[in-house]
């Protein structure tokens, strides 16, 4: 237990005491300008679904972190599922422009380089009774094999171990059951499997929910690294500081529709953003 005087309290100090160490560098992104390519990698056109989504349209660019924010029931979580083909939209379509493919199922999305991190981690993103290795290998080890090329169990285990090491996943071995892990380490396993898949487009729905500040910092660093490698990310979050800290562009939703669009280069005003949410 650490007791502080009011005069000694700061956000940085609180973060350090909560995780037991100092966080080096900037918590979110250090740049204040939007930076992404001109190439459009995904188009969502006039998406409507079950009275929850109403005529939602937008484009995602290569190397862009596109944030979606709003109140919990604004429709953004359903939108994330629809983008990955997990919901059958009533009208509209989601297109991956590189292959000119319409996303109608998770199988199509995955086959064409998409990944999805659900906000319901234990129910939808992990095989809880499986090991760390099984979960990381579940996306098919795409980054290190070609179509039809057999990879030995030994190589797959080596790659799973590499992800454990690079993501600093705390565990006894890759044979440890995921169910026995903390929330933060479970989330690292989820990220590890999409790193193994080398997904070009990632839908991240509340990727830092239920993890400590240290793991959050690791996740932000990883998201930044993926952006710099040209990966495109849809970041759905109920945490406004997270959205403002990470997004190149930020779309606000209310009652299933887009109400505002804002750019990092222009600066994000939290008060203004909240006004568009409510």
What does each model-found stretch correspond to?
Residues 1-278:
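Glycine-rich phosphate-binding loops of nucleotide-dependent enzymes
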């Amino acid at each position: 237990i650490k007791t502080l005087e009011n005069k000694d309290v700061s956000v940085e100090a609180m973060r350090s005491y909560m995780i037991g160490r100092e966080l080096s560098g900037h918590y979110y992104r250090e740049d204040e300008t939007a930076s992404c390519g001109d190439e459009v990698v995904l188009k969502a056109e006039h998406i409507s679904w079950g009275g929850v989504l109403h005529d939602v349209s937008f484009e995602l660019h290569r190397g862009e972190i596109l944030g979606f924010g709003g109140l919990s029931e604004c429709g953004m979580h359903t939108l994330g599922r629809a983008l990955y083909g997990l919901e059958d939209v009533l009208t509209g379509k989601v297109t991956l422009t590189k292959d000119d493919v319409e996303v109608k199922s998770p199988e199509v999305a995955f086959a064409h380089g998409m990944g999805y991190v659900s906000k319901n981690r234990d129910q939808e993103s992990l095989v809880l009774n499986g090991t760390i290795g099984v979960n990381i290998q579940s996306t098919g080890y795409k980054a290190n094999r070609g179509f039809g090329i057999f990879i030995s169990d030994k190589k797959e285990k080596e790659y799973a171990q590499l992800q454990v090491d690079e993501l600093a996943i705390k565990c006894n071995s890759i044979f440890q059951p995921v169910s026995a892990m903390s929330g933060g380490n479970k989330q690292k396993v989820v990220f590890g499997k999409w790193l193994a898949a080398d997904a070009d487009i990632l839908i991240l729905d509340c990727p830092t929910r239920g993890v400590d500040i240290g793991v959050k910092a690791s996740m932000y660093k990883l998201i930044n690294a993926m952006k710099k490698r040209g990966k495109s990310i849809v970041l759905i979050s109920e945490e406004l500081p997270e959205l403002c800290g990470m997004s190149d562009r930020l779309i606000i939703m209310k009652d299933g529709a887009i109400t505002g669009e804002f750019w990092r280069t222009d600066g994000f005003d939290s008060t203004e953003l909240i006004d568009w949410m409510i």
